[in-house]
């Protein structure tokens, strides 16, 4: 499937992990991207309050969620968790969104930004920035996906 450069808009990018979620956002023209502090995943999804605050503060109009597919582009258990979290975000935030193949984004951000052995979440947010930059170049366009069922593994 070939994607095309999406229309410019200010969006939030998520690198969803088991313990933390890396965050990055771009300006409405998709010219600059910036990282935000990673948030810890907590019970009852209490991190959504922080995410909502970022959306309001930066006037974000959509979001993307990285999917850690394997080398062949197939789903992994972590990718399924990311898809389910994306659906949760869609249902809670009521914003258009899309998934982006993030295979090797953490490795790329580690090499590109020189981050090693990070436990602060900085590498997660830089991975979200890499995912965002990929989306800006390649898409796909954001869609209204709220209410779709969760994927089981």
From Swiss-Prot:
Q: What is its EC number?
A: 3.1.-.-
- Gene Ontology biological process terms, A to Z: rRNA 5'-end processing
Q: What is its main location?
A: cytoplasm
* Keywords, in A-Z order: Cytoplasm, Hydrolase, Nuclease, Ribosome biogenesis
Quote one Gene Ontology molecular function term: nuclease activity
- Listed SMART domains: YqgFc (SM00732)
* Top class in the EC scheme: hydrolase
Note one Pfam family from the annotation: RuvX
Describe the task this protein carries out.
Could be a nuclease involved in processing of the 5'-end of pre-16S rRNA.
Similarity remark: Belongs to the YqgF nuclease family.
Put simply, this protein is called Putative pre-16S rRNA nuclease
């Amino acid at each position: 499937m070939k994607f095309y450069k999406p229309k410019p808009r200010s969006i939030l990018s998520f690198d969803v992990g088991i313990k933390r979620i890396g965050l990055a956002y771009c300006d409405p023209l998709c010219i600059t991207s910036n990282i935000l502090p990673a948030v810890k995943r907590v019970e009852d999804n209490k991190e959504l309050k922080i995410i909502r605050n970022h959306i309001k503060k930066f006037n974000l109009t959509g979001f993307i969620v990285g999917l850690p597919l394997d080398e062949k582009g197939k789903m992994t258990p972590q990718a399924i968790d990311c898809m389910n979290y994306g659906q949760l975000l869609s249902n809670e935030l009521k914003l258009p969104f899309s998934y982006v193949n993030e295979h090797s984004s953490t490795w790329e951000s580690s090499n590109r930004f020189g981050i090693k052995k990070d436990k602060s979440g900085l590498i997660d947010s830089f991975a979200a920035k890499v995912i965002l930059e990929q989306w800006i170049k390649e898409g796909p366009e954001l869609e209204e996906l709220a209410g779709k069922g969760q994927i089981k593994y």
